[in-house]
Amino acid sequence: CTKREDRFASALEMQEALLKIDENALYNSGQVTIIDNTGTELSIVDYINSLYSQSSHGNAGTRAGWKELALDKATYTQTRLDKKLLSAIKDGKYRLVIITGNAGDGKTAFIRQVEGIAENVEKLSNRNGAIFSINGVPFQSNYDGSQDEEERANDEVLTEFFKPFEGLKNYSEAKEGRIIAINEGRLVDFLQEPTNNHTNLADIIDEYFYKEGYAELPEGLMIINLNLRSVTAKDENNDSLLRSQVKKLTDKSLWGKCNVCPIAERCFIKYNVDTLNDSAAGDEVISRLEWLIRTIVYKRELHITIRDLRSFIAYMLTRDQSCDNVVQLLQAVDNKELEEEIYWELYYFNISSNEWRLPSQDRLIKLIQETDIAQVAIPSIDRDLYFKNLEEDDYLIFESRKVSLLPIFNERNIRKIVSEQDKGSLRLSKARHKSFIRHHYFEGQYDFMKRLPYQSLGKFYGKLNGNEVDMEETKHSLAYAISCSEGGWNKDISANYLLLSSTQIKDPFSSSYRRFALSDFELLANKNEKLVQFIEHENDSLIFRHKENKYIQLTVSLDLYEMLDYIERGFNPSINDLRGRFIELQVFKNLLQSKVHTELLVARNNRKFYSIKLNAETKKIHIEPLNKDSL
């Protein structure tokens, strides 16, 4: 109790008060009430809203503050850094730990975990780190190595910070330890300056990243690149950061007060939370959410940070609405001022919809909305969703969630042909059907992968995690698709060669190609194994490259794989299809075309080919039919 007048005067007085309580009146709700250092109770809904990057209520929760909130601790998700690197630091294995990554990757949060296992922790007055000791070794932390400190310029700050390591080859010999979060570019710029006496460390870092971690680091040094962390990568317990964070933010102990709320059965926030923390079906719903997020990871358009992840989950749970806002929305529905279908947009399964009020400007949510599952048609299923009553037997069974939306959906599903509907009812009808589709994706009992916008996603996932035999088959498949994109559809030649058109000019009479032996190429998953021993990593792309000239390589993302998969099945892309995001394919082709060549293949109809070859010794040109023996 924080107020002196409310405290018991003595232990005896407290005991007498306790004895007056009937033990049958005691109730263990499992609810945790969290108060801040002023004694004020913290609202979980307000806290969740503060995590959303575009919150109208303030987004203070998106950044690690100088003082950690109780709910920050309660919802903190342990990562591999906490589980593996933390113990290695505690055991004295590393004296210098450098952490790079984007803003929001959790660098500061981890450094604070290190400080949490240390002794004699003293925060620096500049609020950019602390001094402490681990096993008697003095340490200093720096939360942001790119900023100036008080009257000192950044170069001066870094010079002093790295001073214990000047001239060392074995960093374990340093008398003091350091842990720093810093932008990789800024770090290398500083270290490469000869006057800073750290050019050797700059070379080590550069070689380490260039050789994808296969260059050995000096003893006592660890470099972590959080840009390689994936929020959908699974650990040994089959949990991802996404799954762990959802479970933390929807933990039942944090949401106990919702059970006695008068609007509990109609509140979309409670429905969302109860769905995701359900003991029976919650994990399955989260798995389907993981596949949706995995499409973003595999597209490689955005590195999803912990801040992005928490912002996304927050928006999915509350849509930036407070408890008072929910009451007002339900009153608007009751007063016919807001259509029920529009209120449905607030449920978690409509996270890929952009029809709620103003579209979100959060960068991850925008990508999710561009990948809307409601835009994928499955006629046989859609027909039943639109024209039949939805049956409980066709959906997941929830253990503790009390509310089902199916009766509400059935009641609102007015079946009229399009010609009988005005613009308003037609708009609501479309919104209703899209809600049915998205709800069915997350809670329906069926092959949900068919609803994902990328039909090759499952196959791509399998290739990324396949064996060497699978990779060899995939290499031939990709090479054939690239050949097809150049007009080389002949499977006999493409079985062993990659074909590239020798000219961009359309010839109405014939085609000409350069061929490259597939044995000169290799295909591998972008694993970065040596760089990710302390972080969650999931292979997100394939690397198709020349064995000798490794700079000639093509990074195959999900978008490109989907396009090549379509091409292999007969789709003939236009020039516009291959422009823009597929510019890397054109760069790869250009690099191959730049190699010296002495042969061209020509054909009138892509069936009968002729070889036109230059003899380098005699300088004579030989023309001969291409037969199967020369393939």
Write out the residue ranges for each language-model feature.
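C-terminal lobe helix-coil module of Hanks-type protein kinase domains
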Residues: 1-27
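Regulatory extensions appended to serine/threonine kinase catalytic cores
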Residues: 26-36
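N-terminal pre-Walker A segment at the start of P-loop NTPase domains
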Residues: 56-86
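Walker A/P-loop nucleotide-binding motif
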Residues: 94-110
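Conserved nucleotide-sensing/catalytic segment adjacent to the nucleotide-binding pocket
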Residues: 133-179
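Conserved small helical "lid"/interfacial subdomain of P-loop NTPases
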Residues: 208-262
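Extended alpha-helical coiled-coil/bundle linker/stalk regions that scaffold oligomerization
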Residues: 246-507
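Long C-terminal appendages of very large multidomain proteins
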Residues: 404-631
